[in-house]
Swiss-Prot record:
Belongs to the MnmA/TRMU family. It is found in: Cytoplasm. NCBIfam families: PRK00143.1 (NF001138), trmU (TIGR00420). The gene is mnmA. The record marks 117, 321 as: Interaction with tRNA. Its EC number is 2.8.1.13. It comes from Campylobacter lari (strain RM2100 / D67 / ATCC BAA-1060). The lineage of its organism: Bacteria, Pseudomonadati, Campylobacterota, Epsilonproteobacteria, Campylobacterales. Keywords: ATP-binding, Cytoplasm, Disulfide bond, Nucleotide-binding, RNA-binding, Transferase, tRNA processing, tRNA-binding. Catalyzes the 2-thiolation of uridine at the wobble position (U34) of tRNA, leading to the formation of s(2)U34. Disulfide bonds join 92-186. This is tRNA-specific 2-thiouridylase MnmA. One of its GO terms (molecular function) is tRNA binding. The keyword Ligase does not apply. InterPro entries: MnmA-like, MnmA-like_C, MnmA-like_central, MnmA-like_central_sf, Rossmann-like_a/b/a_fold.
Length: 338
């Protein structure tokens, strides 16, 4: 089978390419340039070239910087500007890795696209990975349903530690097993605020109010805060921790309160992405990547919006983040919290 493998220079994509080559497939590698970090790309391309030469495969360098900027980077900036919390990895997977890269794979005559994601595909649906601690099904849940039939995730049945051990047994790949893992958001080197600083003044002090509307302090600028944050702002006379409940970007104000005020029993979704045909779901939801699953009921509207009723309350729901719905280990749908 002719397969395009997304290669980043990391251990996961390297082992993915190696395993598929050993299984007898015709492999082509592809490195994606997504953002403007010349030294970053140069180092990674050298690693990809090293692996490609070792495996005896061709590789391509695909410049997707403009697409990445329009589909991922600027939406990231604008979502924070709107006082919401973005999920750039979900957008990148849909539009770039499983979008533009898949288009490129097809243009080369490849039957499948393989990546180093920790997840599984079964009967046209995304499943959680065997390694719960590395499961990436949450970030893949915004993928176009039509893309799933072309995807292969060879590491879905492996534990991360075993991937590293496997690489360490092959002389040429030993260095990949010990290299530092990439950060969660590839274009954020330190903090997201430093990224925002390139586009706007984030240090405009504003008012902190309690949930009754009373002014209780000052803050450093609303873009420094996300829902649930409990530090970096003033609350006069407070004797217990206060958390960000709401952000008002137009007024440059944040509303704070006690932890109990973060409790949510229902919420609305937009841009729902269904992998099964349904108008209602009785399932479990994750409201952020590392959150536990919560039982819920979902009522889906014709305009791709939905109402989610939780059977147990959750804390700190952030607009702009993605909610992902599961039936045990199967991904049923996703949507963005509104």
């Amino acid at each position: 089978m002719k397969i395009l493998v997304a290669m980043s220079g990391g251990v996961d994509s390297t082992v993915t390419a190696y395993k598929l080559k050993q299984a007898g497939h015709e492999i082509i590698g592809c490195y994606m340039k997504l953002h403007g970090k010349p030294n970053y790309h140069e180092e990674n391309i050298q690693k990809v070239e090293k692996v490609a030469n070792f495996l005896g495969i061709k590789y391509h360098i695909l410049d997707l910087q403009e697409d990445f900027k329009n589909q991922v980077y600027m939406p990231f900036i604008n979502t924070y500007k709107d006082g919401k919390t973005p999920n750039p990895c979900a957008l990148c997977n849909r539009f770039i890795k499983l979008g533009k890269l898949l288009e490129f794979a097809k243009s080369l005559g490849c039957e499948k696209l393989a990546t180093g994601h920790y997840a599984r595909i079964e009967n046209g649906l995304i499943k959680t990975a065997f390694d719960d601690s590395k499961d990436q099904s949450y970030f893949l849940a915004n993928a176009d349903k039509e893309a799933l039939e072309y995807l292969i995730f060879p590491l879905g049945e492996m534990k991360k530690e075993d991937v590293k051990k496997f690489a360490s047994t092959i002389e040429v790949l030993k260095s990949f097993a010990t290299q530092k893992e990439s950060s969660e958001i590839c274009f954020v080197e330190d903090t997201y605020v430093q990224v925002l600083d390139q586009f706007m003044d984030t240090k405009i002090p504003g008012i902190v109010r309690d949930s009754s509307g009373k002014e209780v302090g000052k803050h450093e600028g609303y873009m420094h805060y996300t829902i649930g944050k409990r530090r970096g702002f003033e609350v006069r006379g407070a004797h217990e921790p206060h958390f960000v409940l709401k952000i008002d970007p137009k007024k440059n104000e944040i509303i704070v309160g006690k932890k109990e005020e973060l409790k949510i029993n229902e919420f609305d979704l937009e841009k729902i992405n269904l992998f099964i045909d349904a108008k209602e779901l009785d399932c479990e939801v994750k409201i952020r990547y590392r959150s536990r699953s919560t039982p819920c009921k979902v009522m889906i509207n014709d305009d791709k919006s939905a109402k989610v009723i939780l059977k147990e309350p959750v804390y700190g729901l952030a607009s702009g983040q993605m909610a992902v719905f599961y039936d045990k280990d199967l991904v049923l749908a996703s949507g963005f919290i509104n």
